[in-house]
Swiss-Prot record:
Record-listed NADP(+) binding positions: G125, S126, G127, G128, S129, L211, G234
CC terms in the record's Gene Ontology section: cytosol
Full protein name: Shikimate dehydrogenase (NADP(+))
InterPro entries (alphabetical): Aminoacid_DH-like_N_sf, NAD(P)-bd_dom_sf, Shikimate_DH, Shikimate_DH-bd_N, Shikimate_DH_fam
Reaction catalysed by this enzyme: shikimate + NADP(+) = 3-dehydroshikimate + NADPH + H(+)
Active site: K65
Enzyme class (EC, first level): oxidoreductase
Organism: Clostridium botulinum (strain Loch Maree / Type A3)
Amino acid sequence: MYTTGLIGKNINYSESPEIHNNYYKKNNIPFFYKIFNLNQDQIDYFIKNLHKNNIKGFNVTIPYKETILQYLNDIVYPADKIGAVNTVVVQEDKLIGYNTDYIGFIKSLQYYNIQVKNFKCLIIGSGGSAKCIYYALKELNAGDICIVSRNPEKARLKFEKKVKILNIKDENKLDRYDLIVNCTPIGGPNFREQKPVKLKEVKKNCVVYDLNYTPKRSKLLKEAKENGAFIINGEKMLIFQAYSAIGLWCLNGIKGGR
């Protein structure tokens, strides 16, 4: 039996163990998935003991999607371009990083039959998830993409120079966007009573996507729905990225072994 899991901080709310373990059981895959709640100073120890603990692969979530890069031997496209990794394959002599969030986000839009070509898009946040969504939207030929951040100067170091980056306090014309994506933990399980922005008005047929999936309807999504937007939470993205990660681990674990 191989171990897989999720590393992050304050992540006991995660639905990933249920998704993965149900899939493993249904498909007779000899894996088990668990939560690894780690402080940053515990990551070194976790990495050094991967083989000892029979860990074949793991997912990475907030706040370590960029931190994990320093531990990897190879980073596979598009994770190398994004600069953030959420899935790691553990081989005998190296760690390989992938970004299955990228795939999960694109597949979730396809699931809801949303075509973002030429959409004017707003990304809330500037961390690893935001970078992933930015490159996914570019891949899908979205139109103008604007990023709002609490720290725009720091955010500008992470994105292409041509990207429009604003202070989150300065962007109040949200009715100009066709798609708004919240890539912050605000509104999620650890910040349920907060919203990253106020949606007093949204464009007709605007899509508001909150990558948080707990609660099912964040305060942001509730407000968006009240204003006539089509709303999506991060559940489908979570499921699709999980299946992509499982595929990578199975290819490595069952066929490759170690």
